[in-house]
């Protein structure tokens, strides 16, 4: 049964969050009455207001007004005054993933899961379905540059969504196609141990109906192991692995773009080859994400020409190797990477892109959360090999209390003892421009990494460097 239109006013607590804002926007576009509140007047909040959605800044009980349904994310605490008031009124309270699941019932759905690469892969699947004239509805975990938003209402039969595994609620999503990019030990604060993460991803894939299928990366050992455990569901494998059904080969760089070929082999022995595909993003990880999207698109009957066109015109995702400006031939980028696996992949991509011109890579990292840094300290210490210089800023706490012995100064020390030749500590954003100006030369890439407010530093840095040169 589809959700009826007469459910009354829907109030989102934390509507400015990247996941919540997309759902609110699509609900609004479907004709539902939507409003919400958020702690800050962010770009997402302003975008929703421009679409006619009322948003209150700050959380107060009176914000509920005549709301009849409340939507919350896991970030909302039980003592939130709006949530307390809603429960006193005995209003139905819906988790973000439950509301996303309701929206998915309106369409056939592709859900993109995995520890890393979800947002980019979701955007790539959307781009290829767009190129194939399927006009999908999209709800993503990042701003898709081509849309200027993280959500889009399409007229076609398909919906493409990012499936967030962080709190286990992705298992509620009714997907026809489930994509798994990789599986790493992340979000153990929720799952308790890695075996529980593995079990969740198995259920995610086995939840697809018998007429659906899973798309799984054979290059990742955990995913390959999971493929062998999936029962009674069709699986399409992808990657550079010679055994993959959709395999990328001959990957090479063209400036900051990737060129590659794809060989698609059916189980009946038929082979299709698409040569000289161009993706306007660097990095093996992005070629892998593109190959996942190609696997979905090909299975849905999208032609090789449309796949080529969709990839070639892909505009990227905000905060995924986003170019923020230049200074004296130095290029500055912003990236959301905040896990060692993501950081390593981004820096490897930057290294590939600069190597043709002999440039160097300068990484500016803002560790995100003390708990993540503590649980992955050794991995963080060893993930910067492709950066010539590493500049570590103070930890972005995200509201967490400090942990003794777990801080950015200690990380710099450990990076050095792990063999890195040039790791430095920066006291804060004000220290970055002088430091970068003393290090970077024409042809270098400066890559700002993290899930906190380092993105603001990345956009401010080109101007600050220009002003530095005037001193």
UniProtKB/Swiss-Prot annotation:
Subcellular location: Cytoplasm
Domain of life: Bacteria
UniProt organism field: Brucella canis (strain ATCC 23365 / NCTC 10854 / RM-666)
Metabolic or biological pathway: Cell wall biogenesis; peptidoglycan biosynthesis
Keywords of the record: ATP-binding, Cell cycle, Cell division, Cell shape, Cell wall biogenesis/degradation, Cytoplasm, Ligase, Nucleotide-binding, Peptidoglycan synthesis
Keyword Repeat found: no
Protein name: UDP-N-acetylmuramate--L-alanine ligase
Gene: murC
Keyword Repeat on entry: no
EC number(s) on file: 6.3.2.8
Pfam families: Mur_ligase, Mur_ligase_C, Mur_ligase_M
Listed GO MF terms: ATP binding; UDP-N-acetylmuramate-L-alanine ligase activity
Record-linked NCBIfam families: murC
Binding site for ATP: 114-120
GO biological process terms, semicolon-separated: cell division; cell wall organization; peptidoglycan biosynthetic process; regulation of cell shape
Biological function: Cell wall formation.
